[in-house]
Design a protein with these regions (language model features):
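Short glycine/threonine-rich beta-strand-turn micro-motifs
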Residues: 58-131, 147-178, 199
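Extracellularly exposed regions in secreted/surface proteins, prominently low-complexity, repeat-rich
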Residues: 173-201
Length: 201
């Protein structure tokens, strides 16, 4: 019976879920990233895609991550599987989608990052992508760095190619640079983009 129900959900999800359009083809496309805990349900990604679409944004892709986060509720670092969703939608849609996901899946916090031009009035953060970082080394470096725990609150490494992803406030560049080095990454090889971050909790 369960296999039949799963098949029906996949079938109807494929029929009714909107197709994620290319960013360049949408006049009001505002690119953003959304980071959420990925639970063990194999339908999580599909359900999240639908929820995001129902709240004003389209998912143009997603990446599985190994995440390390600082939990205010538990007052300790937490290691968990997560997923980065690439979004395209109207300005403000990332917040609405993040809040809906947080409530639907009972998550403590969902992080969003909206891309903006450097020096834009609303810019308050950067997203750093550094290649070839081991998740275990990053976890140890993060746990040993109080400033990183308090200021950055976490980070992720892609499960496919070991790429470190950090979202930091613009005033925390030195903290991020130090953490990348402590985790074994190369700051010179890192790519940086500018934008606005929000912890939706």
């Amino acid at each position: 019976m369960r296999s039949v129900l799963v098949w029906l959900m996949v079938l109807f999800g494929g029929v009714f879920a909107p197709t994620a359009p290319a960013r360049g083809n949408i006049p009001d496309c505002h690119p953003a990233e959304l980071f959420a805990t990925d639970n063990t349900d194999p339908l999580f990604e599909m359900q999240a895609d639908v929820t995001i679409a129902q709240n004003g944004a389209s998912v143009t892709g997603s990446i599985p991550l190994d995440g390390v986060y600082w939990s205010d509720a538990l007052q300790r670092s937490v290691y968990e599987r997560s997923r980065e969703f690439h979004l395209c939608g109207a300005d403000g849609s990332s917040h609405t989608a993040a809040d809906a996901l947080r409530r639907q899946f009972n998550q403590e916090t969902v992080l969003t990052f909206d891309y903006l031009p450097q020096h834009a009035p609303e810019e308050d953060a950067i997203i750093i992508v550094a290649p070839d970082v081991d998740i275990n080394r990053f976890r140890d470096a993060f746990a040993a760095d109080p400033a990183a725990r308090n200021r950055l609150r976490g980070g992720s490494v892609t499960t496919t190619d070991r790429t470190l992803i950090l979202v930091a406030g613009t005033g925390d560049l030195d903290v991020a640079r130090r953490l990348v080095a402590e985790a074994g990454g190369s700051w010179e090889a890192a790519a940086i983009s500018y934008g606005r971050r929000e912890f939706v909790d």
